[in-house]
Amino acid sequence: ILKFADETKIFGRVRGHEDCLELQRDLDRLLGWAEEWQMAFNIKKCKVMRVGNNICTYEYKMRAHSLEEVQVEKDLGVLISSDLKVSPQCIGACARASRVLGMINRTIVNKTTEVMVQLYKTLVRPHLEYCSSAWSPHYQKDKELIERVQHRFSRMVPAVRADTYSVRLQKLNLWSLEERRNRADLIEVYTRTQLLLGWTDLFVTCK
């Protein structure tokens, strides 16, 4: 069981019908515990996601209410799919970023380099990088979809519009989004290894 703020997740490995029954019993115990402490789940918002290929079909319930089964669900702002592909998250992030970018293009009259870059960094790029270490894409089509947003932004800046994309990035002092994700992944690995092991213990483990 995992709990964060007002979100609760209960999960288990399912290899057959008995595992489904055990997970249902865990769900019943969780519901009983919540009621004992005078807390209530919003059952209409409770959902089931099955992850994997060999999936045992079972209708999970909370009291007499059958839980809705979903293929994609948002978890702490990130879209998770039952096949664990990150394409839905990439599409959603690009859609949000593109809406903001369109608003900037329509409303900003004086598109100086300094103003446009600051607006992009503040209002657009965070949509493309939120929690990216958890969903960094590995399919080329997803990488290109994300990069296309920054490509579109760079063409909105009059001072660099005539240049190629790589030259525009250099003049705007920007990295490609893939480079930034790779850098974020390296920082994440370094931070976690330092906190959990320390470099000395890590080298001993690798021997």
Question: What would you call each of these model-derived segments?
Answer:
Residues I1-K207:
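Hydrophobic/basic alpha-helical segments
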